[in-house]
Structures are given as structure tokens and as C-alpha cells.
């Protein structure tokens, strides 16, 4: 699992007025909660961009002037019009205890259905899994080679050692859809058999 270090400054003032003042200075108000006490702090918005605007998932190391806390992003709030990050909630990670995190999905292989004209569609870009920090991969690699036209891979079909899926088992991960070209190829194949 990838790690990212962010410098965090503890907040001394709280409330809407203090949060707006922090945003004007290029800082983003944040909370850290979980086991232990809740901590309110600010992080530089430019540093936070490397975490927010990427498909990757990270274990974040929050550096409070030498004291490091490990965490994952739980929730991010954006401004409704501008793409400005307003607030981030972090959840504390403790070594030896499982953590739930959304991991990106990467498809590998060339599906059989695509070879005859079907179209591969990725339905879920990220899946929520639960596992120990040392067992978490950077991404979930799904082999689509055996997929035929009209077939779907569901979360319940996937198995990764040391990971438990939090995303419901009935959630579709990817599918090979029927296209006009594949329908035409199937019809031609049927006529050839007669």
C-alpha cells in the first residue's frame, strides 16, 4: 500500500469564521477520529491535491511536528461550484487492526467477448475492502480473459487473500456488453451452422 506524508498543524480556533480564515490562507480544515481522541487540524491545500485528485488510495502519515499518526481518508467535502476542497475527515489506523479503505480496480487480459465484437465496461472504479494494513495492495487486479459477451464479474466472484469485501457481493465490477457488431457476428455464426 502506498504511503503519503502530510504536514498537519493543530487548530487553535474553531467554528465557521476560523475555517473560512484558514481557507483564505490556503489551508484545509480537517478532523482525525477513531481510536483515541479526536484531533482538529489544518493541512496545506497544495499538499492535499496529491491525495485528493488521484485514482490511487493511500495510507496517510499525518506529521504533527514530529508526532506521526497513520490514517485513511473517510470523507471529503467540496465546494458546490468551485472544485475547492472544503473539509477532509481522516480515520486513524492502528497497526494490527483491520481498516476499511476504497481501492482502485484495474482490469487485465483480453476478454473473449471483446475479441468477437463485445465492449468491456468497467462498472466500479473502486471497491471498499477491509484488511490489515500490511495485506492491502495498491490496486485490485481483476482478470477479464474468460468473460464472454453478456457476462458480468460481480464482487462476490472476487477473492483476494487477507481481504474482506465491504462492497456488497451483488455489485457489478465489469461486464462485456453486446454491441451491434457482436450481434451481427453472432447472427452470421448461427447462419453458418445451419
Question: What label would you give each PLM region?
Answer:
Residues 1-194:
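Acidic, negatively charged sequence tracts
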Amino acid at each position: 500500500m502506498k504511503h503519503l506524508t502530510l504536514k498537519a498543524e493543530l487548530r487553535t480556533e474553531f467554528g465557521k469564521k476560523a475555517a473560512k480564515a484558514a481557507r483564505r490562507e490556503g489551508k484545509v480544515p480537517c478532523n482525525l477520529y477513531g481510536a483515541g481522541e479526536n484531533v482538529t487540524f489544518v493541512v496545506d491545500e497544495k499538499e492535499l491535491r496529491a491525495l485528493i485528485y488521484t485514482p490511487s488510495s493511500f495510507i496517510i502519515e499525518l506529521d504533527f511536528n514530529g508526532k506521526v499518526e497513520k490514517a485513511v481518508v473517510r470523507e471529503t467535502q467540496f465546494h458546490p461550484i468551485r472544485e475547492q476542497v472544503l473539509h477532509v475527515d481522516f480515520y486513524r489506523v492502528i497497526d494490527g487492526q483491520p481498516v476499511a479503505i476504497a481501492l482502485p480496480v484495474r482490469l487485465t487480459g483480453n476478454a473473449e467477448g471483446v475479441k468477437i465484437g463485445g465492449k468491456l465496461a468497467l462498472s466500479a472504479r473502486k471497491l471498499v475492502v477491509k484488511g490489515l494494513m500490511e495485506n492491502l495492495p495498491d490496486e485490485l487486479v481483476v482478470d477479464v480473459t474468460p468473460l464472454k459477451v453478456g457476462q458480468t464479474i460481480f464482487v462476490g466472484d472476487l477473492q483476494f487473500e487477507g481481504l474482506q469485501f465491504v462492497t456488497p457481493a451483488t455489485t457489478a465490477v465489469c461486464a462485456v456488453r453486446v454491441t451491434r457488431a457482436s450481434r451481427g457476428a453472432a447472427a452470421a455464426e448461427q447462419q453458418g451452422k445451419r
